[in-house]
Amino acid sequence: MSGATIEQIQRVMPHRYPFLLLDRILSCATDPEENSNIEALKNVSINENFFNGHFPGHPVMPGVLTLEALAQAAGYLGMMMIGEARDPNTIFYFAGSDNVRFKR
């Protein structure tokens, strides 16, 4: 699969606005003979609610939301790896992360 629109993403992912952090899948490779990978896009605008308090006058996307966007992309990739045989109720959970640091 080469990519996906927001409509195609919503058919696969349970997340919805404001917590769906994928706007487009640019590429998604699930060939079992190769390394599976995904390239996704989130359109971030200055109007995002989290910029109001993080940080006033110096907007920064919170690191935990960046991590969540990565987890959602990984979940989408997992769904594509399962393929058409997946149960429609299948969902991937991000179990956690250790020693994560966010730097500028």
Identify the function of each model-found stretch.
Residues P14-L21, I91-F94:
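Short coil-to-beta-strand transition motifs
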